[in-house]
Amino acid sequence: SIKSLSTGNDTIFTPTDSTDFSVPREVTVHANDGVSKRTYTVDIRVYKENPDSLAWTQVANNPLSDIASFVESKALSVGGALYVFGQRADGTTQVVQTETADAHFDSAINIAGLTHFNVRSVQYFKGQFYALANGQLITSATGLNDWTSVSTSQRFDALAAVVADSIYGVADGKMYASADGQTWRLSQIDTEGHLPTQNLAFTTLQSRTDKNGYMAIMVGSDADGMAVWKRDFDATGSFSYPWMYIPQTEELGEYACPKLSNVNLFTYDGSTILAGTTTEGTMVPFYTSQDNGRTWKANELPHPTLTGVKALAVTVDSEQYIWVICSGTGIVYKGRINRLAMGE
């Protein structure tokens, strides 16, 4: 039976009749013995926004903030916190740490005692931050001001990627991998001569066809424009694959990976998303790859309109918000596809 909205009395529920569930309704279920019963409240909630739309919210707009002064930057989401690493024009290295639930970007902490700290190299691996300072691998437990050198003789031109069990670095045109940051081994690549060391970004994503498979996509600048690499991984450890170079050939036309400044790469809604700017400091449309780095299509995902960008940092937090942090203006946006908030 169901409680009547007009009388407040129980009435027999008829499945073939229409029932008003615009407000919570009390439904009573009776057992076959005619004695036992249990009452439930049925509350049907309808999501009234377009599930596939993405709206951007401006979180900060302070041209006097520390992040506005960065000329190089990198953002990471770790747990419920955002870390924005930046370098100022005078070479000072800083980091802004803030909670995603109540984000503030006005003040930064100086990272002191290190020369040539490469903010674009910062990675998070197995509970530690890693970065390069003058080619030397350094690490920190907090990402703030406790950086120390890692005990390894290996020096690097770039830190390339992080997956579940390994961190990857590029040195002298070769790819290296480590499970602990100290012992490094060569990692196989299928093509020589195209490993990027500048303007480099990576992301990882789950395979659409193999529950035990995932992959890393890496992009960066090389002599020919933008280099794109992919490596497949098997979570069971049964198979091993090399890093594969994905040539951005002429026949790709407008779907080739664009040559951008301030490159960022992230995974969102099952696709690989490329963000960046023109050399004049205008944020370009997001480029989406649904074939793991082979082709790139613009404007599949809405993006904020930004100009005057000196450095751009983009990351995705645990709540599926995309954060876009613009140095030069101090503007910060966040946005999320509505249905991802619904837990799809």
Name each region found by the language model.
Residues 59-91:
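Beta-strand-rich domains and repeat architectures in extracellular enzymes and scaffolds
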Residues 294-299, 306-344:
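Blade-level signature of beta-propeller repeat domains, shared across WD40, Kelch, NHL, RCC1
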Residues 1-71, 340-344:
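Beta-rich interaction/scaffold domains
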Residues 79-84, 127-131, 165-169, 211-218, ...:
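Entry beta-strands of beta-propeller and related beta-repeat scaffolds
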Residues 52-63, 103-114, 147-154, 185-193, ...:
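Beta-propeller fold detector
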Residues 63-76, 110-127, 149-166, 191-211, ...:
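Repeated scaffold domains used in trafficking and secretory/extracellular systems
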Residues 96-101, 139-141, 177-179, 230-232, ...:
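Conserved Ser/Thr-centered positions that define the repeating blades of beta-propeller domains
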Residues 253-290:
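Loop/turn-rich, solvent-exposed surfaces of beta-rich toroidal or solenoidal domains
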